[in-house]
Structure formats: structure tokens, C-alpha cells
Amino acid sequence: MESPTHPKPSKDKTLSWNLAFLVGILFTIDIGMANPSPHQIYNVTWVITNVQTNTQANATSMLGTLTDAYPTLHVDLCDLVGDTWEPIVLNPTNVKHGARYSSSKYGCKTTDRKKQQQTYPFYVCPGHAPSLGPKGTHCGGAQDGFCAAWGCETTGEAWWKPTSSWDYITVKRGSSQDNSCEGKCNPLVLQFTQKGRQASWDGPKMWGLRLYRTGYDPIALFTVSRQVSTITPPQAMGPNLVLPDQKPPSRQSQTGSKVATQRPQTNESAPRSVAPTTMGPKRIGTGDRLINLVQGTYLALNATDPNKTKDCWLCLVSRPPYYEGIAILGNYSNQTNPPPSCLSTPQHKLTISEVSGQGMCIGTVPKTHQALCNKTQQGHTGAHYLAAPNGTYWACNTGLTPCISMAVLNWTSDFCVLIELWPRVTYHQPEYVYTHFAKAVRFRREPISLTVALMLGGLTVGGIAAGVGTGTKALLETAQFRQLQMAMHTDIQALEESISALEKSLTSLSEVVLQNRRGLDILFLQEGGLCAALKEECCFYADHTGLVRDNMAKLRERLKQRQQLFDSQQGWFEGWFNKSPWFTTLISSIMGPLLILLLILLFGPCILNRLVQFVKDRISVVQALILTQQYQQIKQYDPDRP
């Protein structure tokens, strides 16, 4: 994009901030659905956030797919600005160095000021992709509103009409019906461009909005993020009434954990298949069992959408629930004799505390769970066995089972929902982890996670596990999905064995203890250096080479590369202020005396010479006056005159 010519110098666009600003994450990861269900309907909410105050300026919700849910967003300029146009004070010690604007008459504190904002142009600069900006132009960071130089602006309402071919949004003024400005009278209209509709909204995208005026242009920072949720909220299925009411543990300040001197012994070999009716003499260790869940998730995700596994983090959640169910519509088998899947039914009642979606229901479903049913069957008479398709389970009121008996179902007035079972493995873009480990000031934001269930939900319905596929791709996806199912089956068997050891305890106490055991398993992996501990998740780095086992070394390597790239983009003068936290104060303290001393050395000799010359001239005049007073002037006589 060519830089427009403006009457204002570019130095006016640079403020005296010297700290980098990083924003945490609050949004929902962009969902890449599997091929069988590209038309899945979600509740999509677009949120515009005022970064200065960390408040929500606007939220727009709609029902639609992830391809067409891009509505026109409306927000008021004063919701992005506040009472006064002021920059963010990233460091409280920066206030005394001029980090605030001296003028505050450009805010929205009064009605007159709101009207005044309508007369000033504004321009917007993106901060989500600095590498796509104009070549040879340093657009700065959040402290500059990403507009440190002309040519960085991509949209706005100004006389030079800033445009861009690569930015995600356009921001223009809307029409206001409130001429008195008693309410909101500075409407802005935000629309998504074609590039924005194709972008991966895996986190909040930030922009800087600057008011075009004389002097420094004030800054307002805002983010646009997308939140995706299912239409029906998840509900608990199972006999345990304690788990649905459990809340996540309170977040405490994260302290540095000690690294174990020895790495945990892990079994590098792939998990062997276990017969349904017999248990192998050797059970794989806890570390291998959890890593196999992540490995199977990676293989299934890579087979369905390789673009998602090009560069990502797969995280095991350390808080319950550890599995979630997606209700589906499937063709179950009705048999008079119990199939092999019925023989491997768990001996204990396992509760799935999160079931979402709509699918096939069997039995008398109460009103509290009818939202999970797309199709309901009352059941069959006689001693029939209903076996769930491969890769699916029946989530019943009495627990999780791959097969249900109609005789028991009719006798107990139970009900079941056909579900896909997925481990609670969350998917994150690499930026999510790097921003948490980077040593920079940032706002605290709650992460929004995309679980594998949302990304691969409906996979069995599409025919990968339940149906018969043709071609190499179908066979490959079937193998990868079965490996994930084998890892889940092994993990569920281990959980069931743990419950058997506590069978004399209360059911609720047993499952709570089991959940604490999973939390200890996650800590075990963290102490061994296999995972990057991030809040309440255990993250494993993955790319097209597969799952990386030594994650901490990989994380340190990539953080070092990012730091080198960041340092290379900084100017030599800007880099001084990042070397030490007290360097800014030292420079500002001694810069004044140094400048005065330099001016004295440059202009002192010239001023001194002129002063000496002036004194000499005055002395010469005084000496001449003294000499003339000692003598009398002789009168001249003209002899020709009488």
C-alpha cells in the first residue's frame, strides 16, 4: 500500500513509551470442522473490547456456520475512548515521564465533547499482522496505536480515505439519530473484508484507532474476537449428582515448580490392543497412557484437517471433566444375543458430566434432558440388546456403556443418549503459549479453549468409524481414529480399575478421588519436563513431524527465536531501553545535564571570544575619554581675519 502524503510529520505519531504491550487471550479458537459436517450451526458471538479499560464495548450474536457468520458490527466511538483520550499506562512509573496526554478535551465526558468528536477524522491501524504492513515501514506497537508512521493505516474516516487489500475489517462512521448527543451519537460501523472472512480467528485481533488532530494523535485500542458455542448447553449424564455441581478450582498465583532430577520412565512403544474380556499382565504407565491420548488426538486431527496440525499445541486439561460426549444420530444394531461389546461393559457406573449436541435417545427422557434428543425411541419389547456403533457409547442415566439391555432399560425406566466420547484435549495456536511464557507486561485474560470434540464431532456419523469408507483417505482416517479410540479405551479401563480399588467408598467420593488422581498425573508429566504447564493444562507441541515429547526444550528454543526476531526489528535507540528496567530512568535523568554540557562545549568558545572583544572595545573607549580630559583644546587662529 502506498503511503499517502500528509501535512503532519511522522514523528508526531511516536510516543515516549518504551515497553512492549501484549494482550492475553479472551475469545474462542477458530473451529475447523471435519469434512462430514461442514454445515454445523453454532451460536457465534463477536465481541469488541476496549483494551484500555478491558471492558466489552459491543457483543453481537447470531446463529450460523463458521463460514457465513460474519455480521456487520456496530459500536459507539465513546465506548472505545471513554471520558478522555488517554493511552494505556503499561508501567505506573511511566506516568512521570509523560505517558499521559496533557489535553483531555477530546474525550466523551460531556455532551459538547461528544459532539466535537463528530468533526474530527480518524484512522485505524492493525496490530494483528505487523509482517503484512508496508515494506520498509516500522508501524510500532500498541504504545503507538500501531501507527508509528504514515502508511500503516488501513481504514478509517479521513480525507485521504485510507484503504487496504489485506486487513480484516473496515471501520467507518455510521449515521446518528441523536442530534442532541444525550446518548450515543458517534456510531461506528465495522464490516469484515474478504480476507477477514478467510482468516483464522483463533484469538483476539487488535487494532489502534487514532484521532486526527493538531499535535499528537490520541490512541484508542480495541480488539475483535469470536466466541463459538453449541446451541444447546452441555448436560450431565449419569448417576452421580455431585459432579454436575462441581466448580473449577479457584485460580491462585502461579509459582515456579521445581524440576525433577530424573525424568519419568515412559514406555516409548505404541500401546498394544487389549482383548475386551481379558486384561494384559502389564498395564502401561500413567505417563504413556496420557501421552497416548494426546498422540491419538493428534493423529485423528491430522488425518481430518492437516492444516490444523501444521503448528499447534495440544493440551491435557487437569481439571474435570476429562471426557466429554457429543450426542449424535447413528444406526445402532438390535440383536437378540449379546454382542461382544456388551461383554466389556464397565463394572462400575461412570458419569459423563458434559454431554452436548442433539442425537438419538432411547427410553423415557425427562424434560431436563430433552434438549439432547433429536430423535427419541421408546424402546423395544423383549430381551434385545442395542449395541452402539464403533467408536460410540450409550450415555445412560445409570452410567456409560457401549451396549444396553432393553429388559433392564424397561424395568428401570432408564434413558440413554448415543454419544461420541472424546478426551478433554484442547487445541491452541502457538501464539497462545508463547505469550504466556514471554517476559512482557500484559493484561490478564481468561483463555478460551477449543476442544477436540468440537473440531472432530460427528466423525463417526460421517462414516470413518461406523460406516465403510472407500479409498486410501478413508482407510487412513479410520486407522487414525481407531488408534485414538484404543487410547481412550485403555484410559477408561485404567479409570475403571481405580474405581474398583475404591469400591468400598461412596460413589461420589470415589470419583472425586479419581479426579484428584488425574491432576497428580498431569503434575507428574510436568515435573518430568514432558509438558509445558500452562495454568490448568498440560500442553504438548505438535507439528507435521508429529508430537514433540521434549516440549520444554522446544518451547525454550522457539521463545529464543521469537526474541531474536523481535530484537532484529527494533531500532538501535529503541533497543537501549529494553536492556535494563532502570535504563529509562537513568537516561531521562542525565540527558538534560549532558545536553547542556554539550551546548556549552559547542558554543562556549564563540560566546567567550565575543565577550572578550566587547570588553576590549569598552576599555579602549574609556581610555580615550581619560586622555582627552587631561588636555585642553587649542584654539586655532586665522591670521587673515581681523
From Swiss-Prot:
Record topological domains on the Extracellular side: 35-586
Keywords: Cleavage on pair of basic residues, Coiled coil, Disulfide bond, Fusion of virus membrane with host cell membrane, Fusion of virus membrane with host membrane, Glycoprotein, Host cell membrane, Host membrane, Host-virus interaction, Lipoprotein, Membrane, Palmitate, Signal, Transmembrane, Transmembrane helix, Viral attachment to host cell, Viral envelope protein, Viral penetration into host cytoplasm, Virion, Virus entry into host cell
Renumbered residue ranges of the record's region Disordered: 233-283
Compositionally biased intervals (Polar residues): 249-270
Signal peptide: 1-34
GO cellular component terms attached to this protein's record: host cell plasma membrane; membrane; viral envelope; virion membrane
Matching CDD domains: HTLV-1-like_HR1-HR2
Pfam families per UniProt: TLV_coat
Chain segments annotated as transmembrane: 587-607
Sequence segments annotated as region (Fusion peptide): 448-468
Protein transport among keywords: no
Cysteine disulfide partners in this protein: C125-C147, C139-C152, C312-C315, C312-C539, C531-C538
Classification via InterPro entries: FMuLV_rcpt-bd (IPR008981), TLV/ENV_coat_polyprotein (IPR018154)
Site (Cleavage): R445, E446, L625, I626
Processing and modification events after translation: Specific enzymatic cleavages in vivo yield mature proteins. Envelope glycoproteins are synthesized as an inactive precursor that is N-glycosylated and processed likely by host cell furin or by a furin-like protease in the Golgi to yield the mature SU and TM proteins. The cleavage site between SU and TM requires the minimal sequence [KR]-X-[KR]-R. The R-peptide is released from the C-terminus of the cytoplasmic tail of the TM protein upon particle formation as a result of proteolytic cleavage by the viral protease. Cleavage of this peptide is required for TM to become fusogenic.
Region of interest (Immunosuppression), ranges: 514-530
Motif interval(s): CXXC: 312-315
Chain location of the short sequence motif CX6CC per the record: 531-539
Stretches assigned to the Cytoplasmic side: 608-642
Subunit structure: The mature envelope protein (Env) consists of a trimer of SU-TM heterodimers attached by a labile interchain disulfide bond.
Functional description taken from the UniProt entry: The surface protein (SU) attaches the virus to the host cell by binding to its receptor. This interaction triggers the refolding of the transmembrane protein (TM) and is thought to activate its fusogenic potential by unmasking its fusion peptide. Fusion occurs at the host cell plasma membrane.
Entry-linked PANTHER family: BC035947 PROTEIN-RELATED, VIRAL ENVELOPE PROTEIN
Protein name listed in UniProt: Envelope glycoprotein
Organism: Feline leukemia virus (strain A/Glasgow-1)
Lineage, top ranks: Viruses, Riboviria, Pararnavirae, Artverviricota, Revtraviricetes
